[in-house]
Amino acid sequence: AWEHRDPAEVFAAARDQLGLPFFIKPCNAGSSYGIHCIEGEEGFAQALADAFYHDGKGKVILEKAIEGFEIGCAVMGNEEVIAGSVDEIEIAGSFFDYEGKYEMKDAAIYCPARIDEELFAAARDMAKRAYRAMNCSGMTRVDMFVTPSRTIIFNELNTIPGFTATSRYPSMMKEIGIPFPQLIDDLVDLALQRKAGGDGRAEQ
């Protein structure tokens, strides 16, 4: 993560360490606000300023571009952890941006993901391990990439995922037999259990 610095200095360091293209995004934001795919120095300063603008805490993160496609897995629980189904994002552009997420422009979501059983199981296992490693509780959506060599790469956690009846998180839970009303009840129960019993976070 980077704090405010000279754009030319930041670009040079990112190019040397990450190669091109790379991504710049706020450390504290959602809905793909402030995320940019950087393919050269032109426009980088403006993209950097936009990422800082959407962060709120004055920090951004620069990431190496990963060749492959994105998958996600819904995870729920305190001490005991449940992994939902795995979904897959198909996009026409360089990343799943705001228009793709909320208008489904040039994007499609498949639940369950169009991957084989081995990758499916590995993705659910990685999601649960990430959930425990980050000491999560309640709910989280774990986002990952699948590379052409079938390697699963952890991307990030979304601790407040979209939560309409047709959003990704509820859809993945519905796929394993937890309908939306029950999901809400279960999450409320988890919150009450945590409040009554102390921290109640997933053990590593």
Q: PLM features: what roles do these ranges have?
A:
Residues 26-27, 51, 64-65, 131-135:
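Short Gly/Pro-enriched turn/cap motifs at secondary-structure boundaries
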Residues 6-14:
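A short helix/loop element that forms part of the nucleotide-sugar donor recognition site in Leloir-type
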Residues 1-4, 32-38:
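Flexible, glycine/proline-enriched loop segments at strand-loop-helix junctions
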Residues 36-125, 146, 151-153:
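Phosphate-binding site of ATP-dependent enzymes
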Residues 14-33, 56-67:
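ATP-grasp fold ATP-binding core
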Residues 29, 43, 168:
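Residue-level recognition of oxygen-bearing side chains
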Residues 2-7, 69-71:
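Active-site glycine- and acidic-residue-rich loops that bind
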Residues 116-204:
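ATP-dependent carboxylate activation and anion-phosphoryl transfer catalytic cores
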